[in-house]
Amino acid sequence: MATESLAEVPVPGCNCFWYLGVVAAVWWGLRAAWCLLDGARVWVLGSGAQVGPRIGKWAVVTGATDGIGKAYAEELAKRGMNIVLISRSPEKLEEVAKQIKEKFKVETKIIAADFGKPTEIYGRIESGLRDLEIGVLVNNVGVSYEHPEYFLEIPDLENTLDKMININITSVCQMTRLVLPGMLGRGRGVILNISSASGMYPVPLLTVYSATKAFVDFFSRGLQAEYRSKGVTVQSVLPFYVATKLAKIRKPTWDKPSPETYVQSALNTVGLQTQTNGYLPHAIMGWISTSLVPVSTAISLGMKMNKGLRARFLKRAKQK
């Protein structure tokens, strides 16, 4: 009898590994195809048609005098909605309201409110919004660190914690409490809660800010599950860097768009995504950072980056 070749000797379990490989390849192929189809649905076919005066004559925007908030106010006015602008500075509110009224020929209303002082404002805001048919609420107002910092070394820590929680968390809950009943009564409405990519995973040295934005994301997705069957859409918007004063970025780039470019893109995702990065390059970054990069690696990279930013800030401060 001829001696069997080693290649002909069966290896236990080799067929199992082959089948597992086929299953894995098919699974990854289907997942990639689904991502491409879903991406085309959102980024190519999305039109944002759900957002406009047909769901309510008025839109309410917090943090409305600069950056993303101002861009939302302008884009919603461009779509024919009257705008309630809520922010801290009466002078800036008057200026932005005048610009919007003259440019888009819509009605405007202003409410000056410091969201860092919650006991003083919500009764006044409720009175200011009474009897308005509010179709859209944009919870945009927010505050971050002056620079990346270790938790216990944050300047004026006790007051900073109160301020950040009141502005980034309490405002979202309270404004939703004021506006949602009217939307439910009419069976339609859109609430856009501006979170941050910093809320997608912990960001060291911006820990409190990151945690507040994670709250906004979870709050939004939970509310969407509760109220979507009643005609109200709640969306969590998680931008990466946008060229705003808050981000301290002056010049827009392809991955750091102007607020206007970002908002036009983000509004096109309403009704298509409950949780959105709002802008195609940001969506790609979000997919990479959550699907391909382990959370532990993302945290380590965030720590390294923010330690560098902190060192540069402190060096400049020392030179002044």
From Swiss-Prot:
Q: What is its main location?
A: endoplasmic reticulum
Segments spanning the bilayer are 17-37, 189-209, 283-303
Under the heading CDD domains, the entry gives: 17beta-HSD1_like_SDR_c
Q: Annotated pathway, please?
A: Lipid metabolism; fatty acid biosynthesis; Steroid biosynthesis; estrogen biosynthesis
Q: What is its EC number?
A: 1.1.1.330, 1.1.1.62
Q: Which residues bind NADP(+)?
A: 56-85
Q: Enumerate the active-site residues.
A: 209 (proton acceptor)
Please name the GO terms of the biological process aspect recorded for this protein, alphabetically.
estrogen biosynthetic process; fatty acid biosynthetic process
**For this protein, what reaction is catalysed?**
a very-long-chain (3R)-3-hydroxyacyl-CoA + NADP(+) = a very-long-chain 3-oxoacyl-CoA + NADPH + H(+); 17beta-estradiol + NAD(+) = estrone + NADH + H(+); 17beta-estradiol + NADP(+) = estrone + NADPH + H(+); 3-oxooctadecanoyl-CoA + NADPH + H(+) = (3R)-hydroxyoctadecanoyl-CoA + NADP(+)
> Where does this polypeptide localize?
Endoplasmic reticulum membrane
How this chain sits in the membrane, per its record, is: Multi-pass membrane protein
Q: Which domain of life is it from?
A: Eukaryota
> What is any one of the record's Gene Ontology cellular component terms?
endoplasmic reticulum membrane
Which key words are in the record? Endoplasmic reticulum, Lipid biosynthesis, Lipid metabolism, Membrane, NADP, Oxidoreductase, Steroid biosynthesis, Transmembrane, Transmembrane helix
Per the record, the coiled-coil ranges are none
Entry-linked SUPFAM superfamilies: NAD(P)-binding Rossmann-fold domains
The answer, when asked if Transmembrane helix is one of the entry's keywords, is yes
Please tell me where substrate binds in this chain: 196
Function, as annotated: Catalyzes the second of the four reactions of the long-chain fatty acids elongation cycle. This endoplasmic reticulum-bound enzymatic process, allows the addition of two carbons to the chain of long- and very long-chain fatty acids/VLCFAs per cycle. This enzyme has a 3-ketoacyl-CoA reductase activity, reducing 3-ketoacyl-CoA to 3-hydroxyacyl-CoA, within each cycle of fatty acid elongation. Thereby, it may participate in the production of VLCFAs of different chain lengths that are involved in multiple biological processes as precursors of membrane lipids and lipid mediators.
State the family it belongs to. Belongs to the short-chain dehydrogenases/reductases (SDR) family. 17-beta-HSD 3 subfamily.
PANTHER family per UniProt: RH59310P, VERY-LONG-CHAIN 3-OXOACYL-COA REDUCTASE
Protein name as it appears in the record: Very-long-chain 3-oxoacyl-CoA reductase
